Amino acid sequence: MGVLIAKKYSTKLFLNAADHTYVECGTGGKAWGCWGGKTGGTAFNSGTGSTKRADCIAKPDERAGITCYLINGVCHQAANRILLPAGILVSAARGYGVSSALFGTYGKTGFWPCSAPFDQCPGVSGDLPECIARSRSPKAAITRTQPATEAEVKYNRSVKQAYAKFDPLAASPLDTMQFHANLFDRQVKFRLGEDLGSVAVSLRLVKENFELDHRHIVVKFGQKKMSPAEFIKAFNELTLKFQDDTASSLNKTQYKKLLDMGHDERVVLADPAIILSLYGEATVKEVYGKL
């Protein structure tokens, strides 16, 4: 069985941006970019799994069905999909707590106007020729992260089951928003516990408001009533508002547990390098100015 490695590196924004993540097989002979670059990263998680299945999930564009950037998800969701055969996630990447709160573990699967089917390729097994180690080498020696706890395994299994049961083709926009709000509820309960009382109600409202606002800008963007730069800036504002509203609902310890960041720390998810590849330099400058 092959090895799948989660890798990450800091983006150009560095201090207030999430890490970019991608996936590489254990030999280093194949990598999947997950919307962005696929070299120069640091390994931070790994597991055994079929590299042929990972490649099937990734698809030729290496985006794993995360069809529209900032609509269905970001690199974290694409990487999680590709890592499915190994049963691991990119949860140790900076900003992952925010991206998973906004897009779920495996992305928004049915959010108009971009469908993002999660083809898990269950019938595919084996390994790519370039991912088969012919001898022991430094590339094959992977530093593994702390093994998942029983609670983490149970939580991840419940998330996979939720995605498997949800039919995006039969779902209305409201169904989709509720599905992702329910995924966030799972994340909250896993990170903070079951007995949250009014805190759980407050966080649910924060998430539902994000879902409504996100859908609003996605529809406007799809109808070409927003330019790419306007959409990205609006998405960044929603991302920051979500963090502000979440921080207002939680104490410092709770915020750290939920989003894996300090109470006053904020990140944005829109990677300038990916925006550059999608929309060009003028859009990057309009969104972020001179980097």
Regions found by a protein language model. Give the residues of each.
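Non-catalytic ligand/cofactor/substrate-binding and regulatory segments of enzyme domains
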Residues: M1-T149
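Charge-rich (acidic/polar
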Residues: T143-L291
